Each structure stands twice: as structure tokens, then as C-alpha cells.
Amino acid sequence: MYRKSAYNRKYRKRKAKAFRLCRRGETEREVKRMIRYIVKRSGDKVSFDARKIKSAIFKANTRIAAERMSDADLNELTEEVLTALEKLPGTPTAQEIQNVVEEKLLAADYAKTANAYINYRTEHEHLREMDDELVKIFENLTFRPSEEDDLKRENANINADTAMGTMLKYGSESAKAFYDKYVIPPEIAEAHASGDIHIHDKDFYALTETCCQIDLLKLFQDGFSTGHGYLREPNDIRSYAALACIAIQANQNEMHGGQSVPNFDYAMAEGVKKTYRKQYFRALAQYIEVRFDMSASDAAALTAAIKEALGTDVTMHTAEAYAEKLRAFLPRHQAENGFQIITGDAARAAAEYAAKTAYKETDAATYQAMEALVHNLNTMNSRAGAQVPFSSLNYGTDTSPEGRMAVHNLLRATEAGLGDGETPIFPVQIFKVKEGVNYNEGDPNYDLFRHALRCSAKRLFPNFSFLDAPFNLQYYKPGDYNTEVAYMGCRTRVMGNVFDNTKEVTCGRGNLSFTSINLPRIGIEAKGDMKTFYKLLDEKIALVEEQLLHRFKIQCSKKVYNYPFLMGQG
């Protein structure tokens, strides 16, 4: 009786211990360490941990609400797996362990959990593959210079040897790996990996679009926000040029392609007008002060009276008419108020001086503004400080004196080059050629066309687009810059609109994304058979169409808060 009671007490203690071990996530069999090691996929031999088996089963089961296991069921199933593993010859491998887990789940009628476990295992295999590939990529990016690593040289606009350039590549390469495994359909990812197609800017696949034509006239009116602060409407050509750079930079940070201005001359003309107006009245006050021996305060008061009576809308084009108004107004104003006599001829002389001085000062300010713009677009940072903005400017058709002055000085600044005389890479410049505007001798902007040719011969920019080409002329309406086809930095054009032909305009348009097809490979595979060639081409076109629509669906899900400048200010 004593021996039996002692045995029962010993048995109960052992069961209690086993229960406590199971509650802690362990098993009685694990404590006995009957399996000491496993062989990982890498071939490394590591210590065996039964808790990982239990954890994997638990995580798979939590995905299936209809097959939720109790703790006891989970422990029992883990024990069955361990028992089966003990019967295997030699040290079990990771693959063998996973096969046994699947087998035991199916035998216990946990089919859905088994399927979830298989998916869980597949995900981890992908992660392991991705980790191995990325670690190698990161190692090269971190420790090898660009001359030894192609990845660091694939984008000439990124200095991947710098800290920010390397950081940008970290994000780029990990994003591409993630999209390949979890976002892009497998057959499309494989086609890209094999070189049948090339998905451009794949690192931004689920994030943004390519490029945009920015209407600076619309943007600058009443000011705008970059997403980090609100900017007032510019009132000087220097401010116009500076904010043009900021607009390009802000949009570059929200898109993966280059940014273009389709109406640069029209937009800058407004800044030239404002600068001319300020310089005109400043020069007029200076002339009145000196010529008529007035105090600075009296000259300022008289200038204010002139502005109130005649308005401030004086431009290079209307300066002559304004001079005639001043000639009639000033003698009468002085006489009516009992002030110093100023004759009509003296008033006109004041206006002529103001116009001449304002033109000279505005021209100098415009050159400085364009010089600063060229330097800024080759030095200011975008995208985490790793690039300069990929910028393009379209111009050449604004025949106003102000627009012509802006283009003339941009060409002068481009000819002068950067600080050491080097040719500026940015902005890409496109001169829009149009008969009746600038193409033929006698056209109002013909001199600008000749200047552009001289500049291009020296500095490679501007390039030239021809608005009289049939595929461009069909959209053109005289005097409407929104109907003038403009080009992106990548030389693409977006103008047509098959959905609504009343909206075939330039401003605000852009590209969503690009994918290239490997035509030489198709030609080689066709072996001279045109029927086979077009059959293969049709297959690749269908695949690319599927891919572009897949990417478009992701892009359509984006919100304004994803693009505070592009959509918030557009």
C-alpha cells in the first residue's frame, strides 16, 4: 500500500510539472532534449527549440477563426510533431520539420490551419530570400564605391556615394524587393526580372506618378503652399524665378519623374511687369526730386498722387501712353493745388526718364533672376538631398516685351554657364518654334529664335519643338499657351484626351508611369518570322497593359494628403 501511494504521489508530481511546463510554452519532451539540434536551410547546425514549432502553429491557427485551437490541443499537436521528429534518422532539417507540421495538422483535421501554415512558411521563405538578397545589396551600397557597383551608377542624377544618396538607394532597393514579393503579380515580376519588360521607377510602384506640367501662372496667383508653409504671391522677377525653383522642387519630392513648366515665358512675364512697375515709379520719384529740387518726401507725395490719379498699370508696352497722360495731368494738378509749376514737356521728360531707367533696371534684375534660376536648379536638393530637381522649361511664343526679356536673359544666363563656366545640365530647355511667331525673318520673336540657336550651339540647350508639326498643330490656338504642346524632361508630350476632347490642354498634364518592352529580344526569338514576331509582341503588350492597369489601380487609391503639393495645390 505504501509503495503504491508513493508511486501515485510521484506520478501526480510529474504530471503537474508537465502541465506547468506546457503553460510556460514548453513541453515535457523538450526538457528531456531528445532532439538537440536542427539543420537550417543555410546548412548551419543550430540548437533545437520546440517553442518555435508551437509558435508557428499558433500563428497559423490565429488566422483561421473557424478552427481555433485550445491550449491543450496546441500542446498535444506539438507533442505529436516532436514524437514524429524523434523517429527521423539523423538531425532533422528545417524542411523536414515543416513537412511534419503540415502532416500532423492535416491528420488532426486542421486543413485550413495547415493551408495557413503553408502560406506562413512561404512568406517566411520569401522574406529569407529577400533578406539574403538585400543584405548583399546593402553591403555593396555601404562599402563599395560607385565605380565598383552598378547600382550606384544607374541614375546619373543621384550621387550614391554620398550619405543621402546611399540612404535613397537603401529605400529604393528594399522597395523593389518588397513589390516583387508582395505587390506585383508574379508573372509580371518575373517578366521584369528576366528582361522581357522593364518597369520604370519600380521603386515608386505603389507610391506616386511620374511627371507633371506645372502652370506657374495659376500656382502663383494668391500664393501657394509647398506642404510645409504658405508662400505669398511673388511681386518681383527675382521672387518669380526663386518660387519657380521651389515649385519644381516641391513637386519633384512628390513624384518620381522630372518636372516641367509649359509656359515659362508667359509666367515670368508677370514678374517682369511687376518689377518694371516698381522701377518706373521709383525712377519717376527720383527724377522729380532732382529735376524740380523737391524734398524726398514731397517727391514721394507727388508720385503717390500720380499713381492715384492715373493708376499704376504701366508696362513696357503702355509706357508711351502713360507718358502722354502724365503730360496732361501734372501741370493741371500743380496749378490746381498751388504747387510748383511743372510744364507738360517737363512732365513728359520725367516719364521718358522713368521708362528708360525702369527698362534698364528691370533688364538687369531679370538677368540676375535667370542666372540665379539656372544656378539654383543645378545645386538645390530634392528627394532626401540626394538629387537636384529634374527640371524642364518650355518657352519661345510669348511676344510681349516682358516675356521676350525673360527669354533673352535666360538664354544669356545659359550661355554664360555656371560658376566655372561649365555647361548647366538643368534646366532642360525647349524652345517652341512657330511660324508667324518666331520661325521666319520678320516674326516678332525671330531674334529670340536666332539667339536660341546660338545658345544651343554652345550649351546644347535649348532643344527645339515645332508647333507646326501636324501632330502638334491640330491643338494650337493662337495666343493660348494652354494649347501649345510642351514637352517633359524625358521628351514625352501629353496633349490628347480621348475621354474628353474639350480638355486637350497642356497645363496640369503628365505621365502616370512607363513600362518598356524588349523588342530586340522578341526579334531574336522570332528568328525572322514576322507572324511569330507580332504574336510575341501582342503577348507582351497584353502583359504590359495588365501591369500598367495594376499600377494605375494603386495610384487611384491615393489621397490628397499623400500629395500635399501636387494635388493640394494643383
Where do the PLM segments sit?
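Conserved catalytic cores of very large enzyme subunits
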Residues: 123-127, 133-570
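Intrinsic-disorder-associated, low-complexity terminal segments enriched in Asp/Asn/His/Tyr and depleted
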Residues: 2, 7-11
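Short regulatory "switch" loops immediately downstream of catalytic or recognition motifs
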Residues: 1-3, 20, 61-62, 273-277
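Intrinsically disordered, low-complexity segments enriched in serine/proline and basic residues
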Residues: 14-21
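Charged, amphipathic alpha-helical regulatory modules used
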Residues: 8, 30-144
